[in-house]
């Protein structure tokens, strides 16, 4: 299946520098053994250390996949998913070691990685940068936030609505660089023709709800979606850096008739996005296997 990828990032309207980093590689640009590689890393730490952590992470992932091309190309299914988790563990060691330096102490980064091979997506994830799948017109969050508020919602301490404005909403419970032995979530799921995949930093979903993300995705031309999402986050205050990385699988999603792209636009790339309950979605997807 043909994979089209695109991405955009923005500092926002409050921060003076961008601590996000990303990878959006498809086709001949993708690392050996995969058809596309998508990564979003949202760095944290003072004195620009967050930028260092996110850049070390995305660069380390690409370098590791290139260095271990023979091993990764032979792996399939859960074995490839586990391999990607191992890659993040190795990158974590490098970031953790660098974070022991005085000027980088406390730095870290979220990391959400999606590798596509054939009709499967392999996800490795730590932190609260999200992965969303749009399938058959329905938007699903397929990653779980590693955050204080997510744990509180799971325990029934607060509601999902209260989590959006809770004082601890920016507190994450896992990240690259914080521990020598990070707990990384990995999963494998099948992809279908027409699927859309979105990875984003929390600068997007903390500013606009999933309903608005869905509306933008379904009412914008594909080549405009990344910028439209960032503009929407900035219009709501742009309190954080915002990064979106998008991939489409197979047939292009058509824009609404009123905004149909011209023939000259038909070679541009496209995108994916968001939704609520990750557990329900993963179970539903796995039942199709």
Q: Where in this protein do the model-derived segments appear?
A:
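PP2C/PPM-type serine/threonine phosphatase catalytic domain
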Residues: 1-289
